[in-house]
From Swiss-Prot:
The gene is ydiU. InterPro entries: adnlytase_SelO, SelO. It comes from Shigella flexneri. HAMAP family: YdiU_SelO. Coiled coil: none annotated. GO terms for molecular function: AMPylase activity; ATP binding; magnesium ion binding. This is Protein nucleotidyltransferase YdiU. Keywords: ATP-binding, Magnesium, Manganese, Metal-binding, Nucleotide-binding, Nucleotidyltransferase, Transferase. Signal peptide: none annotated. Belongs to the SELO family. PANTHER family: PROTEIN ADENYLYLTRANSFERASE SELO, MITOCHONDRIAL. The active site is at 246 (proton acceptor).
């Protein structure tokens, strides 16, 4: 089957990119590709037989027209000015059979005009982390970019140490970022901001294109998508680590996996980025940061969208987020209805977990085994203050009984939203260290496991992390 690529970005937004081709790596080797995703995109298996080929930037497929995008952004609250694709190149937009499109974006593709002080390369460590994280999030049901392939090489890349250069093929419906809009707003080119908005509406919100109120309705939906995404992050214990405005997806996708982390111990102020000294992007601050970022996006639209309309959309953010968060947390607790004491029960559980540094994922998974008429629970053994747990658990079981739902039905619901497996940093690190020694078995094994996060397991993928695994520090270097 012939793949079809179109050039909407190149044709319709001529001042938002620089056209250039990838710079291949030395002795590139394909070490992993996403068979399931490739099948979804109708990519023939024969394409993966050329280990470097398009995956390593050596060739282009017919219809591809590679370019590096320019955008700007706020980083840690500070205006950073022009940024852009410093090591990534958009190879093309694949046109799928249903009329939708998928960007093919090659990360680690070499120097671009937006590389600033960088070398345009990515290392094997970071490409493995992003491939694992994006696929883990996808199978958790959270909107995200996807990973299609990883190529390693003999090209040395200099970070804190010398590491092997690598490339990741990332795919997504769009790479539109808040930072694209900021770039032209701060250059005082509001007509180009409007062109970006029109492009987004035309291709991703086409049902609004002929509506005279299209900009207000569109921004309302951007706010809603962002609120929903952040709510989902919070419920699975995901910390992004670098929520700069240039890393915010207009479509509400999880974008740019750098120093991310999933909660091990329940620590509301968890900071996964060792460069975040003030805790700007801590786990519990993510909802507020996302709203701040939306306010920056709204500012760029103010030349052609009424300020009252923008503020009305921003004012809806908190309620949308709380609605999505509340619905998912009630499911995680096994509540079939909404009752006034639900928030108090959840907050008391969080307080108990924080005091005891309980494992976030394991606590909710074990809670899924609760029988409403039995005081026995394997979760009890996880707590030191058994009296405090017993008091909370008795009230929790009383709340379950109000719903008049069988244990089996409730347990099935809870186990479908409380994963047994999340991508803990130590699991990723183990796969990385093996891969850097030439052993790709753990990378493939972990990828396969992450496809079924809600299935029970009896291996170390679902155990508490070792002490060294909790102390892993992750930086933005990639």
């Amino acid at each position: 089957m012939t793949l079809s690529f179109i050039t909407r970005w190149r044709d319709e937004l001529p001042e938002t990119y620089t056209a250039l081709s990838p710079t291949p790596l030395n002795n590139a080797r394909l070490i992993w590709h996403n068979t399931e995703l490739a099948n979804t995109l109708s990519i023939p298996s024969s394409l993966f037989k050329n280990a470097a080929g398009v995956w390593g930037g050596e060739t282009l497929l017919p219809g591809m027209s590679p370019l590096a995008q320019v955008y700007s952004g706020h980083q840690f609250v500070v205006w950073a000015g022009q940024l852009g694709d410093g090591r990534g190149i958009l190879l093309g937009e694949q046109l799928l059979a249903d009329g939708t499109t998928m960007d093919w974006h090659l990360k680690g593709a070499g120097l671009t005009p937006y590389s600033r002080m960088g070398d345009g390369r990515a290392v094997l460590r970071s490409t493995i982390r992003e491939s694992l994280a994006s696929e883990a999030m996808h199978y958790l049901g959270i909107p995200t970019t996807r990973a299609l392939s990883i190529v390693t090489s003999d090209s040395p890349v200099y970070r804190e140490t010398v590491e092997p250069g690598a490339m990741l093929m990332r795919v997504a419906p769009s790479h539109l970022r808040f930072g694209h809009f900021e770039h032209f707003y701060y250059r005082r080119e509001p007509e180009k901001v409007r062109q970006l908005a029109d492009f987004a509406i035309r291709h991703y919100w086409s049902h609004l294109e002929d509506d005279e109120d299209k900009y207000r309705l569109w921004f309302n939906d951007v706010v809603a998508r962002t609120a929903s995404l952040i709510a989902q992050w919070q419920t699975v214990g995901f910390a992004h680590g670098v929520m700069n405005t240039d890393n915010m997806s207009l479509l509400g996708l999880t974008l740019d996996y750098g120093p991310f982390g999933f909660l091990d111990d329940y620590e509301p102020g968890f900071i996964c980025n060792h460069s975040d000294h003030q805790g700007r992007y801590s786990f519990d601050n993510q909802p507020a940061v996302a709203l701040w970022n939306l306010q920056r996006l709204a500012q760029t639209l103010s030349p052609f969208v009424a300020v009252d309309a923008l503020n009305e959309a921003l004012d809806s953010y908190q309620q949308v987020l709380l609605t999505h968060y509340g619905q998912r947390m009630r499911q995680k607790l096994g509540f079939m209805t909404e009752q006034k004491e639900d928030n108090a029960l959840l907050n008391e559980l969080f307080s108990l977990m924080a005091r005891e540094r309980s494992d976030y994922t394991r606590t909710f998974r074990m809670l899924s085994l609760t029988e409403q008429h039995s005081a026995a629970s394997p979760l009890r053994e996880e707590f030191i203050d058994r009296a405090a747990f017993d008091d909370w658990f008795a009230r929790y079981r009383g709340r379950l009984q109000q719903d008049e739902v069988s244990d089996s039905e409730r347990q099935q619901l809870m186990q479908s939203v409380n994963p047994a497996l999340v991508l803990r940093n130590w699991l990723a690190q183990r796969a990385i260290e093996a891969a850097e020694k030439g052993d790709m078995m753990e990378l493939h094994r972990l990828h396969e496991a992450l496809r079924n996060p809600f299935s029970d397991r009896d291996d170390d993928y679902v155990s508490r992390p070792p002490d060294w695994g909790k102390r892993l520090e992750v930086s933005c270097s990639s």
